[in-house]
Regions:
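Bacterial N-terminal signal peptides that target proteins for export
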Residues: 2-18
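Bacterial N-terminal signal peptides
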Residues: 17-27
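N-terminal Rossmann-like dinucleotide-binding module
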Residues: 26-81
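Beta-loop-alpha module in the N-terminal Rossmann-like domain of NAD(P)-dependent dehydrogenases
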Residues: 80-145
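C-terminal helix-rich "cap/oligomerization" subdomain common to oxidoreductases
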Residues: 102-104, 331-371
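Rossmann-fold dehydrogenase core element
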Residues: 141-159, 179-181
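Predominantly a Rossmann-like dinucleotide-binding segment in NAD(P)-dependent oxidoreductases
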Residues: 162-242, 246-250, 366
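Contiguous beta-strand/loop segments that form the cofactor/metal-binding neighborhood of enzyme cores
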Residues: 225-300, 327-338, 358-359
């Protein structure tokens, strides 16, 4: 029997090398898991609560918040116990000082272009809350700046992180229902005022200039984005839309309901966007040549095949980096994923803006708009 000499110098060196390798591995993993350094632009979007909660949990490193309204500084400082040093009124001064990895927009949709005007020449990527812009003209300006200065401009949609939607997409790509023939998206809720949105959020959300429209922009963008994704970036050939004003006393300036028909060469999309649903809804139906898929919510899917075989399933949880906007953003900036042909990409969201612009023109004129 050979006895191992624990005091042999070679064994000591091996232990040292193993220990060093372990330390390097741990250090590398720790570095890889460091939260992304961001600047937040704007505090008048109610989605801000999500990112500030993540900051307090250490999920994201917010190095500064730029908001011209100091009243909102105090509001969110008190709610989330934030230091005064985090707040600024000037975005350009803040990003020059802190040099963040990205800027996250939580301001009025019409002001997204202002963020890009500041960040693009400085080479700083931007992610905004949906939709990309209030108007197609603003979106084209964003696209031009992003191209000129070679930055990423991404758009965050809640539904991008729905496991059920990703599962439906994957099943379609695997030819489980044949070619897409019809897509139906229902999105909305009882109304922003009815569900308790803050006055600062309501101020711009119900303004035709600051939001670009009412429910048409607010919730029509979801269906337009999903259909662009399902059609793999194909542009539609025509758009027809009807908007309604069911609650003029509450929303005097903008539509509160929109129905949008999107025509593709061999498929049709129907978007039903409203502030008049009896409950909050985000679901997606896809009819194929020989089957039907319905993402009922974030997780649950029902199906029906031509032979009348019915089924249901719970989608598997999404895995990184397509399971969370911050993880996704980090992966794009690290060139681990392209961010050029998905729901968040600028390429797809320019098509979204073309659809929304055509829908507004169609609703105003009563005509089918050919793209």
């Amino acid at each position: 029997m050979i006895k191992r000499n624990l005091k042999h110098p070679l064994f000591g060196k091996q232990k040292l090398m193993l220990l060093l390798s372990f330390i390097i591995c741990i250090a590398g993993n720790t570095s890889a898991q460091q939260p992304i350094r961001v600047v937040v632009a704007g505090l008048n979007h109610d989605h801000i609560h999500g990112i500030l909660s993540q900051y307090n949990k250490g999920v994201v490193d917010i190095v500064g918040i730029a908001e011209p309204d100091t009243r909102l500084h105090k509001k969110y400082r008190d709610i989330y116990h934030l230091p005064d040093s985090l707040f600024f009124t000037d975005l350009k001064k803040l990003v020059l000082l802190k040099k963040p990895a990205a800027v996250l927009g939580y301001n009025a949709v019409a002001n997204h272009v202002d963020i890009v005007e500041i960040c693009a020449p400085l080479g700083i990527p931007v992610m905004v809350e949906k939709p990309l812009a209030a108007t197609l003209a603003q979106a084209k300006r964003i696209e031009k700046l992003a191209g000129k200065y070679h930055i990423k401009v991404l758009t965050n949609y809640e539904t991008t992180w729905y496991a059920s939607y990703r599962d439906v997409y994957n099943m379609i790509r695997s030819d489980s229902i044949g070619l897409i023939k019809k897509m139906v998206a229902h999105d909305g809720h009882q109304g922003p005022k009815e569900i308790g949105c803050s006055p600062d959020f309501l101020h711009w959300l119900t303004d035709p200039i600051l939001n670009g429209a009412g429910a048409l922009n607010d919730f029509g963008c979801y269906g337009a984005d999903l259909m662009t994704w399902l059609m793999q970036g194909k542009k539609p050939i025509a758009v027809t839309a009807v908007t309604r004003h069911y609650k003029p006393a509450i929303y005097p300036k903008v539509d509160d309901d929109a129905t949008i028909i999107i025509e593709y060469e061999n498929a049709t999309g129907l978007i039903e966007a409203s502030w008049n649903w009896p409950f909050g809804i985000k679901d997606l139906e896809v009819f194929g040549e020989h089957g039907y898929l319905h993402a009922l919510d974030k997780e649950n899917i029902s199906s029906r095949m031509r032979e009348n075989r019915k089924g249901s399933k719970v989608a598997e949880p999404l895995i990184a980096p397509i399971n969370d906007p911050l993880i996704y953003l980090t992966a794009v900036l690290q060139n681990k994923i392209p961010g050029t042909d998905d729901q968040s990409s600028l390429q797809y969201n320019m098509i979204v803006m073309e659809i929304l612009d055509a829908a507004k023109r169609s609703a105003a004129s009563g005509k089918r708009i050919v793209l």
